[in-house]
Structure formats: C-alpha cells, structure tokens
C-alpha cells in the first residue's frame, strides 16, 4: 500500500484527539475537590467519578483496538471521538454526582475506542523509516498533556468562565472534539485488516474479566484501605488472564481470528518492550502523583503554579525525542538505557533538593531536575513504542496498539497503588520526626513572644498532639491548635498575636517537613523502577530493523 500523502496532517488530527484524552485524565483529578463541593458529593462518589473512567478505558482498549482492525480504524476513531465529545458535554451539564459518574463511564469507554487507533494508524500509514518520528511526536504530545493538565485546570478554575466553576474542565473538550472529528473525516485515510470480520466474544469476555479483576482493586485499594477481597481479586486475575492467553493461542492455531494474536508475544521486540513499558509507566505516573501532591498540599502552591513548574518535563521530552528518532537506527536500545539513567539522575537530584532544602523548595532546582528527566524520557518513549510495534504486521496493528495502551494503563495503576500506599504510610510515619524538627524554632518564637518555659511546654505538647492527630488523616492540613496555656492572670497565651503567629508558622513548617520527608522517601520507588528499566533495556533488540517487509492492508 502506498503511503498516505495526507499522513502528516492526519497525524496532527490524531494527536489532537490523543492530547484531549491525556489531558482529561489529570485535569479532572485536579478539579475533583471543587466538583465535590459544588455537587455535594460524598468522597465515595468522587472516587467513582475517577475510577469509572479508568475502568471503562482500561476494559475497552484491547477490544477497541481489534475492532479498528476489523471494521476500519478511521471509522472506530470517529465513533470514539464523537462519543467522547458528547460524553464531555454531558459531564459539563451534569447536575448530580450520579449523572456525572455515568457520563464519565461513557467518556472512558469512548476513549478506549479512540486512543488505540492512533498508534495503529501510524503503523499502517507511515513507511518504516518515518514511524520513529511519528512515535516521537506521539510521546511528546503525551508528555506535554500530562504536564500541561495542571496549568489548564488551574487556569479554567481560576478564570471561572461565565460563572460555570468546574464545568469548563469538561466543556473545553467539545470544540476540540468537534475539530478532531472534522479533521479526521477529511484527512485520515481508512484502513483495516485484509481478513473477514469475526467477533471473538469469548476472548473479549475473558480479557475484560481479567483486566477488571486486576484494575479495580489497584484503582480502589488505597481508598478502601486494602481489604482482603482486593488481594483475592488480583490473585483471581492471574488464572483468568492465563486462560485468556491459552484460548487465544488455540484459536490462532486453529485458523480463527483471535482478539490478541499470541504470536505477537513470540517477538522479542514486542514482549520485552511491553515489559519495559510496564515498568517505565508505573514509575512516571506515580512520580507525578507524588510531585503534584507535594507541591500543592505540602507547599501550598496553586494548581497553576505547580503546573508551570512541571512543564519543564515535556520541554525536555521535546528536545530529545526528535534527536532520539534520528539516532535510533544507529543506537537502538542504547537510547533507552541512557534515557533511564538520565531519569534516575533526575529523581536523585529531586531527592537531594527536597532533603537539602529548608522551608520552601527552590522552584528552579526542581525545574532543572524535571528538565533532565524529560530529556531522558524523550529518549525512552518514542524508541520504546517503535521497538514494541516494529514486528507487528499492519493487520494486527489495532490489537497490538490496544495491548500496548492496556499495559501502560496497568503499569500506571500498579505504580499509583504501590506509591499511594507508601506515600500515605510515610506521611503517617514521618509526622513525629517532622514535629521534632520544627519544635526548636517554635520554642524560640514562643520565648521571643514572652511565653514562660512552663507554658511553652504545654503549648508545644498540645501542638504535637494536634499535629500527630492531623497526620492520621489522608491529607493532613497545617495544625493551629488551641491549647489552654494560661498566664498568671488567667489570660490564654493563644490570644496573643505573636503566639498565634508562631503556632501558625510552626504548623505550616511541620506540614512542609512531613510532605518533604514522605516525598523524598517515596521517590526511591521511581529510582528503583527506572533502574529496573535500565536492566530490562538490555533484553530489547539491539536495533530496530528498517527493511522488514510490509504486509498489505486494505484501504477504503
């Protein structure tokens, strides 16, 4: 099949839709507190608003990808974009949390149909030598979207357009979705596998059951304090997924059309690349989770301020992704190895910055570290996708894309589950050391305010009790206790402005200290994950072949 002459404008349209979806994942998380207050939703309701999207998205990625192979990738993409746009409008108009949850589930399902078509269309529309550049653009857009989400969310919430509060967070997708739909209809060429359509219902059922058993406890486990049934579900996922793999392999041997061809996993580039991607995306998702919480809850930055700091990451990706694509033919997997080392250096620099700082973080140091990490990720993302997809025939492009996106989703869920549990545990465990660290300054401030030693002891003890009690909460705020320390004439010392100011400063300092300590310790997960990715990079093929034959695909 001749290359599509409109493939580059068409790719811009596909990436616009992908950007819309990637931003939506994070932008809603940032707006969740405002949504909860406006709709009077319970904490469980907000969790289902977030989890419903993630579950529907994860469940339909493989099915949506294979459906594109069979009935047309452009057709499925257009259906997904249209449904995503309608669901976004429904979210923005929702008057209750129940309606919003239903709309979010539809939105996630639509994204599961839409997103796999992006990589699949790149695979069938671009010649072998152009694909790394296209994958590099895809990786850069993904990195930009995840980092730009706090900026976009912060701006929309701060501007409060037309007095709509949080609703523009969803409604902004409507014009973007319409533009993507029209652009795809005009610029993207239809393609599908040269095989008769056949629905693998058993494969769909088994894969959906296995992914649901795995993803649901990973998404909800931390919020429910990891009940026994969560571990039982994850354990049950293993035999279900094993049965799915066995069934698909048998169907393929018998000449049927499987949902996921197991022969893909016989390719070293596909299986090793997916394993490396699983580890990488578990680290990236959890890293930004910790960083954003630390900047906002720990240091009191607004979503907009935090987002402006994290923009350094996609800037780094943009710098190296194009260079990595040019060097891919000569360096191959070594780019992934070097990129992993750069990201490890980024994490270590962040740990040193957090542990070495006193009071507020140096934003420039954080941005420098993130720029370094982005440079590394720009070497990893496009090359890893190119390696994974390199041995995939066009007839299986959608299935492979769905599997690739599902693995990334599972990796992110695993990373968030592990790091979420670690972060909460460290917040609780580091509360006492954090209070101890700020106590000398609190005593000095109280002495300056004229508080006698005995009253200082009482104030400090009450402050400590309050701070430790607050640390047991999921999101501990600063502590300004109201102890009953009394002067000799019976007046409370806490009524003195200098004393109250000292307690407020100590509370804010303790909050920063406990979040810094927890974040620094939790970041070691990302260090370990990228160290593992570095080792796994040696299992990848040394280079991606550029001269492989191109199986034909039907174009309509």
What are these regions (language model features)?
Residues 158-275, 283, 301, 309:
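Hydrophobic transmembrane-helix bundles of small-molecule transporters
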Residues 87-92, 107, 184, 349-351, ...:
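MFS-fold secondary transporters
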Residues 35-36, 67-68, 152-161, 218, ...:
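Interfacial helix-cap and linker-helix signal at transmembrane-aqueous boundaries
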Residues 73-79, 335-338, 522:
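Juxtamembrane helix-start motifs in multi-pass secondary transporters
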Residues 8-56, 232, 249-399, 548-549:
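Transmembrane core module of solute transporters
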Residues 1-10, 386, 442, 446-556:
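Transmembrane-helix exit segments and adjacent C-terminal regions of multi-pass membrane proteins
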Residues 1-186:
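Transmembrane-helix bundle of Major Facilitator Superfamily
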Residues 133-142, 147, 366-465, 521-523, ...:
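Small-residue-rich alpha-helical segments with characteristic i,i+4
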């Amino acid at each position: 099949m001749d290359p599509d002459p409109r493939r580059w404008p068409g790719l811009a349209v596909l990436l616009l839709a992908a950007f819309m979806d990637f931003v939506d994942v994070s932008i809603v998380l940032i707006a969740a507190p405002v949504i909860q207050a406006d709709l009077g939703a319970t904490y469980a309701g907000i969790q289902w608003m977030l989890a419903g999207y993630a579950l529907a998205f994860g469940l339909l990625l493989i099915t949506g990808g294979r459906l594109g192979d069979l009935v047309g990738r452009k057709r499925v993409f257009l259906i997904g974009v249209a449904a995503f746009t309608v669901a976004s409008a429904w979210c923005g108009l929702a008057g209750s949390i129940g309606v919003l949850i239903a709309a979010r589930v539809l939105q996630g399902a639509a994204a599961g149909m839409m997103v796999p078509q992006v990589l699949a269309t790149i695979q069938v529309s671009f010649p072998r030598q152009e694909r790394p550049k296209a994958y590099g653009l895809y990786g850069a857009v993904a990195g930009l979207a995840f980092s730009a989400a706090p900026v976009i969310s912060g701006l929309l919430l701060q501007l409060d357009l037309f007095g709509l509060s949080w609703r523009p967070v969803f409604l902004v997708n409507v014009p973007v979705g319409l533009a993507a739909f029209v652009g795809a209809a005009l610029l993207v060429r239809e393609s599908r596998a040269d095989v008769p359509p056949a629905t693998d219902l058993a494969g769909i059922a088994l894969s959906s059951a296995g992914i649901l058993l795995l993803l649901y406890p990973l998404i909800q486990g931390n919020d429910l304090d990891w009940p026994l049934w969560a571990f039982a579900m994850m354990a049950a996922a293993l035999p279900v997924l094993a049965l799915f793999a066995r069934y698909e392999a048998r169907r393929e041997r018998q000449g049927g059309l499987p949902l996921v061809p197991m022969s893909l996993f016989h390719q070293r580039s596909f299986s090793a690349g997916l394993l490396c991607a699983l580890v990488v995306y578990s680290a990236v998702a959890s890293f930004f989770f910790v960083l954003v919480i630390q900047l906002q809850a720990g240091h009191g930055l607004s979503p907009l301020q935090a987002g402006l700091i994290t923009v350094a990451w996609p800037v780094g990706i943009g710098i190296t992704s194009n260079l990595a694509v040019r060097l891919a033919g000569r360096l191959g997997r070594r780019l992934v190895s070097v990129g992993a080392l750069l990201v490890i250096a980024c994490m270590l620099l962040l740990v040193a910055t957090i542990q070495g700082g006193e009071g507020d973080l140096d934003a420039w140091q954080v941005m420098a570290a993130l720029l370094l990490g982005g440079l590394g990720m720009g070497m990893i993302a496009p090359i890893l996708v190119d390696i994974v997809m390199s041995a995939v025939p066009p007839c299986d492009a959608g299935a492979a894309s769905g599997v690739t996106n599902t693995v990334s989703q599972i990796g992110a869920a695993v990373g968030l589950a592990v790091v979420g549990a670690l972060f909460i545990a460290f917040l609780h465990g580091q509360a006492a050391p954090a209070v101890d660290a700020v106590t000398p300054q609190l005593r000095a401030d109280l002495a300056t305010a004229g508080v006698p030693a005995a009253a200082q002891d009482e104030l400090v003890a009450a402050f400590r009790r309050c701070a430790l009690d607050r640390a047991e909460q999921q999101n501990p705020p600063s502590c300004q206790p109201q102890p009953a320390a009394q002067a000799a004439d019976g007046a409370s010392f806490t009524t003195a402005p200098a004393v109250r100011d000292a307690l407020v400063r100590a509370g804010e300092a303790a909050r920063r200290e406990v979040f810094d300590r927890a974040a620094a310790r939790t970041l070691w997960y990302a260090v370990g994950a990228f160290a593992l990715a570095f080792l796994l990079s040696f299992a990848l093929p040394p280079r991606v072949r550029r001269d492989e034959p191109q199986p034909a695909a039907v174009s309509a």
